């Protein structure tokens, strides 16, 4: 295809989840195939090495978001008991993982809520960032031992504490969980089921740094 990427087609009026890079998707795919299909391992290893060596601003190897899924490749490789990527690549990915995990712990030391977030991280759907960083810290814990593993695990729990109420609003961002759980998710099935309380277990998108509706713009300086 002459253009690799995604933008909403003409006439679409919904929010755009655009993506101009497919290196992360191909990296993840090659990692999964390398791990699961032994019949074409050389082919998949060659592809994995190719995409591992590529660099792009949107490919971090530590993110589990919708724009950058390259962290899924890291998750796949570092939980592979067969170590099919080879010892050298495994050490490389472990170092990338631990470097980012240590950065996230450093952010918690600067946060009043022990949260691995900076002001610029509160994007649309910021709780996805909170959850994804918790996943990364859990993976770092699983790849470590002793006090180091415990340190990463506690940092992951701090992310969960934030979601369940240890935040500036004193609310749980998970419906049905906690005394002050949020009750009005933007979700059509739970809005039309004729039950006042929302379905339990939905996670709010969370705070957004940029007010974008009239009520928020009027209330926030």
At which residue positions do the language-model features occur?
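Long, compositionally biased eukaryotic scaffolding/regulatory segments
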Residues: 113-115
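Aromatic (Trp/Tyr) and acidic
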Residues: 13-54, 68-111, 120-221
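Internal amphipathic alpha-helical repeat/solenoid segments
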Residues: 6-8
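Zinc-dependent metallopeptidase catalytic helix centered on the HExxH motif
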Residues: 57-67
């Amino acid at each position: 295809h002459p253009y690799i990427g995604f933008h909403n087609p003409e006439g679409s009026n919904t929010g755009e989840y655009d993506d101009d890079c497919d290196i992360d998707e191909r990296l993840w795919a090659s990692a999964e195939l390398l791990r699961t299909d032994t019949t074409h391992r050389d082919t998949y290893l060659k592809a994995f090495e190719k995409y591992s060596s590529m660099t792009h601003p949107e490919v971090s190897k530590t993110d589990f978001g919708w724009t950058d899924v390259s962290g899924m490749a890291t998750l796949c490789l570092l939980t592979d008991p067969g170590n099919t990527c080879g010892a050298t690549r495994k050490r490389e990915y472990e170092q990338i993982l631990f470097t980012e995990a240590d950065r996230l712990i450093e952010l918690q030391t600067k946060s009043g809520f022990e949260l691995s977030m900076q002001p610029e991280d509160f994007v649309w759907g910021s709780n996805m960032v909170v959850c994804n960083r918790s996943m990364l810290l859990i993976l770092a814990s699983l790849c470590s031992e002793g006090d180091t593993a415990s340190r990463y695990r506690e940092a992951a729990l701090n992310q969960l504490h934030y979601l369940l109420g240890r935040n500036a609003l004193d609310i749980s961002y998970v419906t049905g969980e906690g005394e002050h759980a949020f009750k009005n998710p933007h979700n059509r099935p739970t809005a039309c089921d004729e039950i006042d309380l929302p379905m339990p277990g939905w996670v709010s998108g969370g705070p957004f740094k940029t007010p974008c509706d009239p009520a928020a713009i009027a209330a926030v300086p």
